[in-house]
């Protein structure tokens, strides 16, 4: 199976968010953010666990008040995934959640306050061995930058980021990552390109406020795909007006499509036409639903006829090619004698995929123990 990626990652420094390495060649971390009221501890914990179940490496939680900070303490004690506290306006909240074991502090240069407040946050982060994310956003730039540039521009986002990078440099603090997000794809992409040339710290990617599930996924895939293909980016979040679980799925799908990082099954499926010998669309949809729990990276081709089916099956771990009444089954590119009844394809294919995933996972485990 062809699984090489031509992408060469941008060199960067290494930080840790909890036990998750960021930068310096580490796997690109996929993040999301809770959309519950943080003071609703039970609901927030449930959402974090749902995110962790689908593969979230890191979860960000908004902490807008001191009451939310107290709730954060309870939330942190109940979950395993590293948590980032999202801090705006009141720097004292950052100091409080640091006491409660937060794994990373996100501060917004546009509203966190003057240099003295930033110094307080940095010294607290240093004392607790916590990294910081400088999170610039085109929708909340500092007033003087808006006066200077009249609107969010790549140069404005870069200047906002660099003035705070300079502050952290003066304070001899290097445990940080930076983001320069915007809702416009080209604005965000150019901002990240400029920033990538200026610093060596890890970059957190995102198209902010991208939109609903469909449009937001497309916008994020285009913008982040451009950057990732250039080797830019060490962690990412897909911002959707949708269930945060979908953000994680889309994030992994983008990385999977670029062969940067794979988790779970990569379905290769035809859009179907009158040549299909079974219902391709319903088959793929049902298998995606049933096999969400499979984390082994593997390619599965499901093609409704013999035009492209055999060719796709040759480069898949498991392949299915539509045939009259019964469809052909391939394992590691080799046609098997066994054929699947078209009326029972989903059950048959699910069993084969699960067995293959288990076999591949065991193979990887054995390899790891012998190296």
From Swiss-Prot:
Membrane-spanning parts: none
InterPro entries: Dihydropteroate_synth-like_sf, IspG_bac, IspG_bac-typ, NO2/SO3_Rdtase_4Fe4S_sf
GO biological process annotation, one example: terpenoid biosynthetic process
GO MF terms held by the record: 4 iron, 4 sulfur cluster binding; 4-hydroxy-3-methylbut-2-en-1-yl diphosphate synthase activity (ferredoxin); 4-hydroxy-3-methylbut-2-enyl-diphosphate synthase activity (flavodoxin); iron ion binding
Catalytic activity: (2E)-4-hydroxy-3-methylbut-2-enyl diphosphate + oxidized [flavodoxin] + H2O + 2 H(+) = 2-C-methyl-D-erythritol 2,4-cyclic diphosphate + reduced [flavodoxin]
Keyword Cytoplasm: no
Binding site for [4Fe-4S] cluster: 270, 273, 305, 312
Gene3D superfamilies reported in the protein's UniProt record: Dihydropteroate synthase-like, Sulfite Reductase Hemoprotein, domain 1
Keyword Iron-sulfur found: yes
Record keywords, A-Z: 4Fe-4S, Iron, Iron-sulfur, Isoprene biosynthesis, Metal-binding, Oxidoreductase
Required co-factors: [4Fe-4S] cluster
Cofactor info, note text: Binds 1 [4Fe-4S] cluster.
Enzyme nomenclature, EC number: 1.17.7.3
Domain of life: Bacteria
Associated pathway: Isoprenoid biosynthesis; isopentenyl diphosphate biosynthesis via DXP pathway; isopentenyl diphosphate from 1-deoxy-D-xylulose 5-phosphate: step 5/6
Function, in words: Converts 2C-methyl-D-erythritol 2,4-cyclodiphosphate (ME-2,4cPP) into 1-hydroxy-2-methyl-2-(E)-butenyl 4-diphosphate.
NCBIfam families from the UniProt entry: ispG_gcpE (TIGR00612), PRK00366.1 (NF001540)
Family: Belongs to the IspG family.
Protein name: 4-hydroxy-3-methylbut-2-en-1-yl diphosphate synthase (flavodoxin)
């Amino acid at each position: 199976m062809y699984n090489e990626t031509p992408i060469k990652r941008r060199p960067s420094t290494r930080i840790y968010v909890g036990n998750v390495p960021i930068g310096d060649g580490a796997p690109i971390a996929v993040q999301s953010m809770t959309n519950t009221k943080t003071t609703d501890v039970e609901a927030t914990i449930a959402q974090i666990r749902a995110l962790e179940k689908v593969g979230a490496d890191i979860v960000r939680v908004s902490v807008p008040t001191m009451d939310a900070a107290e709730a954060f303490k309870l939330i942190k004690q109940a979950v395993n995934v590293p948590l980032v506290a999202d801090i705006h306006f009141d720097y004292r909240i950052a100091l409080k959640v640091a006491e409660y074991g937060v794994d990373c502090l996100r501060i917004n240069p546009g509203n966190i306050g003057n240099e003295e407040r930033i110094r307080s946050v940095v010294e607290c982060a240093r004392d607790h061995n916590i990294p910081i994310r400088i999170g610039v956003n085109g929708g909340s730039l500092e007033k003087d930058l808006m006066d200077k540039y009249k609107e969010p521009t790549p140069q404005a986002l870069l200047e906002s980021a660099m003035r705070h990078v300079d502050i952290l440099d003066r304070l001899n603090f290097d445990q940080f990552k930076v983001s320069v997000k915007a809702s416009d794809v080209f604005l965000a992409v150019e901002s990240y390109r400029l920033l990538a040339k200026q610093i060596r710290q890890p970059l957190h990617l995102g198209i902010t406020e991208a939109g609903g599930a469909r449009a937001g996924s497309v916008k994020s895939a285009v913008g982040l795909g451009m950057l990732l293909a250039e080797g830019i980016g060490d962690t990412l979040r897909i911002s959707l007006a949708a269930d945060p679980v979908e953000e994680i799925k889309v994030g992994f799908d983008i990385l999977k499509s670029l062969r940067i990082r794979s988790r779970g099954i990569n379905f290769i499926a035809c859009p179907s036409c009158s040549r299909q010998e079974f219902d391709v669309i319903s088959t793929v949809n049902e298998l995606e639903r049933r096999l969400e729990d499979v984390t082994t990276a593997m390619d599965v081709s499901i093609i409704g006829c013999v035009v492209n089916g055999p060719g796709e099956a040759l480069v898949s771990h498991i392949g299915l090619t539509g045939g009259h009444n019964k469809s052909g089954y391939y394992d590691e590119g080799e046609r098997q004698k066994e054929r699947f009844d078209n009326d029972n394809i989903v059950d048959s294919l699910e069993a084969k995929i699960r067995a293959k995933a288990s076999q591949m996972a065991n193979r990887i485990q054995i390899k790891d123990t012998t190296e």
